[in-house]
Amino acid sequence: MARHGDTRSPSPVGSTYSSSRRSRRDDDRYEKSRRDDGRSYRRSRSPERRYRDRDRDSYRRRDRSIDRRDDHRDEDSYRPSRRDRSRDRRRSRDRGDDRDHRRKSRERDYRSRRDDSRDRARRRTDDSADLKHKSRRDDSRTRNLDSKSRETSKPSTPAPAAPTEDEKRAERLAKLEAWKQKQAAERERKQREAAAAGGARSILEEIDRKSGLSPAVGSPQSPAATPTTDATPAPYAGKFDPKAIVRNAVPAPSTPAVLGNDVAVPQSAKASASLSSMNNHVQANKPPAAISTASSTLTVKRNVGGFGLGARQVADAEKSSAVKTLGFGEEESKRKKLERLPTPPLEDAKDDTGAVDAAVEDEDDVDMQDGGTEEENAAAARAAAERREERLQSEALRAQSKEAAPQPNGDVEMDDVSHQAESEKMEVDAAEEEVDPLDAFMSELAETAPPKKTTGARFAKAKEQQPEAMFGDEHDVDLTAVGEGDADDFLAIANKAKKKKDIPAVDHEKMEYEPFRKKFYTEPSNLAEMTDEEAASLRLELDGIKVRGVDVPKPVMKWSQCGLGVQTLDVIHRLGYENPTSIQSQAIPAIMSGRDVIGVAKTGSGKTIAFLIPMFRHIRDQRPLENMEGPIGLIMTPTRELATQIHKDCKPFLKALNLRAVCAYGGAPIKDQIAELKRGAEIVVCTPGRMIDLLAANAGRVTNLRRVTYVVLDEADRMFDMGFEPQVMKIMANIRPDRQTVLFSATFPRNMEALARKSLTKPIEIVVGGKSVVAPEITQIVEVRNEDTKFVRLLEILGNLYSDDANEDARALIFVDRQEAADTLLRELMRKGYPCMSIHGGKDQIDRDSTIEDFKAGIFPILIATSVAARGLDVKQLKLVVNYDAPNHLEDYVHRAGRTGRAGNTGTAVTFLTEEQERYSVDIAKALRQSGQKVPEPVQKMVDSFLEKVKAGKEKASASGFGGKGLERLDQERDAARMRERRTYKTGEEGEDEEDKEDKAEKADERFSKVVSSVQSAAAAATTPLPGVPKGIDLDGKITVHRTEKDPAGASKNPLDKVGSAVADIHARLSRAGVMRSGVPIDNRGPDAGAFHATLEINDFPQKARWAVTNRTNVAKILEATGTSITTKGSFYPAGKEPGPGENPKLYILVEGETELAVTNAMRELMRLLKEGTLAAADSDARAPVGGRYNVV
């Protein structure tokens, strides 16, 4: 809002003088009411800050404070339009914001007086047209001009306004000077009264006098500025700086005339430093003629003073001045720099004078701020001065030391002073100060920024939000904390996770296991009376049971002879098991006797019950489980489906015997299985991988194997195969050695049997119906078909099956070899209208379980599966098994076909063979013969053809067993590692690996034969001999490889023999001096010499050919392929030059190896490279120009 009595008219005529006069009276009247108005000093100046007609300017200049009224920089200084406003404007704006907040925290009386005085001073000088450039910067209280000097200066700067304006201006100046004298006298009176008080207030009075001297010291500079202003260019004479007037509008006790004429200066001994500084300023303000003579040296000092640093030469006066001008020292120094830089028309002397005037104005500000009529202002200032007196003294000393060195750049000193002002200001109004975020950001990033300034800015904003650099260095740690993780850390994490699955090895000697009982079987009397012949006859009747072992119990005929409990017998009768099957009648007595058993029986013969019933008796004999104890019975299976089926077979007995069982397999949530194990379970049916996870989970606190005494490996041949054997053995090693182990399977290859026996103790082997034999109840059909006719034949078989009403509820199981084939066949059958589903290892476990259940329940009659469903799957209505893709070995075929014809039922197994699968026909024909069925003629032809190829060495007989899948890459890596070790650690005694060497030689021979054939074809096409090949060397000829000569072990010790051999060597060397024929080495008789060697002379070949056989890349390839050693020896001799006696032979290559074949292959490859290099050299020579265009003369 506008002030009382003010007019908003920008016209300088008629209204300004009256407005300023009313403003002075109104300001005195409303001083108290406006004391608490924090915005009055900004809002009240807005009317006068509009465009005004200047006395000597014909254009309007934009007042920046209209757009930025809150910018205190604009309130304190006004920059002419000819000034550069690029960089300094932003800096002043930022500091103006700080000043705005500092003013809010000042004493309210002082602020009101400052606003009043500035308003009055501005209104008195608003329309002055004859003020010089410097007088515009200084207000009436700092110019120190008397009325006489004003009148003298007016003619020098004629005013474009009317003569009435001159009279008004003179009257205003006279009143202002009288008011200033009155204020100075009042202040001096108060100082004398305070000095008379004495006592503890004397110290504070000393500080006030020092600060009060600063205007007196600075006042002589103003009259000196007047003659300098007279010499300024005309456009600056009639202008003034309204910002400077606003800033200096506080009632100034300084005199308008020369120092000492109107103001009584207090005499103090401590003012000597200030007086010396005053003398320096007076000397600096000499007329331009005098200043120009020493402008270079004076410029440094004056710049220092111009930036508010001239006071630093005055130690004591500056201490008090810095305290009183707490919030303005930084801004003043910045503002003076901004005013001096953009005045190119001015000379150095004028700039220096302006800088000195700025220092005077800065000092006068101190007096205006401190000089007042109210006691509380002085008390607050004195208290602040008393608190900081000691600190300011030390800073003043540092400032003096810096002042001694000349500062070529005033900006640097300005930063120091601004920091000093900020550091002092922090004690008074740290909570109110605000640092511009851009300044804080730049000060943090700039390495050349003074650290004190940055520290002060951060400390001054301690109670406010700290300015944060969004892309500063402090964020680098957060950004790179994860990304800069070392590879070792990740490897450590991976190893740690890997170690979690490792089961710690158990030292059974240190463990204390509870004793347990294995033997529960008591042979019935009728069986005990049976002779061995009768027992053998009984075994023959029971499907030809074959047993092997010591003290094998006789087979039982009824369940009552097995020594089972009443609860178990009740469940057996409830399940409808009338009599034991063949495998059950022999295996149950053997297991109940506490013996380790290997049971091999046909599919569907009841092997699961054969090991479950003895286990229940075994568990019931031991004490119940306590908290955190593991199972007693452990059953491991290769597939998840088989584990689920065994667990399902246990359930009828568990409830009757009050036992608990847990089925643990991969694919299912492990948390549920952990919860069940923690509740306690006597039986665990699991797959090996998931069991290892459970044993390693929670540092082994989930479960343990300390109480396991009964272990079953179902489908044992698969468990000891390449895929499961390491995991199974790891688990078995953690179980007590005196456990009882039972192995069951429908197939048991001989190599698997030998491996399994290592885990057993004096086992009894029971074989029912032969190993790997298809049950006779299964009808086997094998057809040889092309790939494109298999699907049509499958549709025909399914149509014939379901055409009979008796087979309406029949199931059909179709086996394929790959997961993709299962999904493809499923899609094709669904298109033909057959409801079916697929199951394979790529599906989720929940899908696999639900599919098996739906298939058993008859929801869909056809199931397409891989071999994952070949073992243990028991579906009673399954009447048809189709091997859409032939199994790759005998055991897989037996298990696939055994899914049908179970428990005495009949079934059909159809197998499709293609011409490319004759390798598999051998096992299928063998299964047909063992089961007593005729082998079809097309299948027999395929078998004969394959066996002939095996005899001829073109094919390799397939081994029995699964052997693992997808391990070819691992085999290759293992073989390569073994070969590298052999080459690295050669001993010359690797005679046992002849097969590997032959295989390697054959592969190398095939590889190089192709290369040689291409080279030979190229050579045959050429009718002329290859150009560039030396005479006597045939690259396509036979390669001669020699065995390395070794000194005999028992060399003769006769000196004459040694002399004779030496002479022979000399003669031989002389006879072949300089001649390096192929196959004649010179120096390969060292201890590292290979068993075979060959040489190839390359001296006379073209350079490209020599490079082809000696560069590192080609040689490395040959070394890797052949395992030989290739060395370049001899010296190169130009064409036509032969080596003399005793000289090195011509350049040649020595190839050494452990076998003749390897050396031959390496030599063949080197010759090929030589030929290619020679051809390339001849081709390049043919393309080369005959002569150049220029000759060197």
Curated annotation (Swiss-Prot):
One of its GO terms (cellular component) is nucleus. GO terms for biological process: mRNA processing; RNA splicing. InterPro entries: DEAD/DEAH_box_helicase_dom, Helicase_ATP-bd, Helicase_C-like, P-loop_NTPase, PRP5/DDX46/KHDC4_KH, RNA-helicase_DEAD-box_CS, RNA_helicase_DEAD_Q_motif. Residues 24-87, 94-153, 165-193, 384-393, 416-426, 966-989, 998-1009 have a biased composition (Basic and acidic residues). A motif (DEAD box) lies at residues 714-717. Keywords: ATP-binding, Helicase, Hydrolase, mRNA processing, mRNA splicing, Nucleotide-binding, Nucleus. Gene3D superfamilies: P-loop containing nucleotide triphosphate hydrolases. Its EC number is 3.6.4.13. This is Pre-mRNA-processing ATP-dependent RNA helicase prp5. The keyword NADP does not apply. The gene is prp5. GO terms for molecular function: ATP binding; ATP hydrolysis activity; nucleic acid binding; RNA helicase activity. Residues 8-20, 223-235 have a biased composition (Low complexity). ATP binds at A601, K602, T603, G604, S605, G606, K607, T608. Its main location: nucleus. It is found in: Nucleus. The keyword Hydrolase applies. SUPFAM superfamilies: P-loop containing nucleoside triphosphate hydrolases (SSF52540). The Q motif is unique to and characteristic of the DEAD box family of RNA helicases and controls ATP binding and hydrolysis.
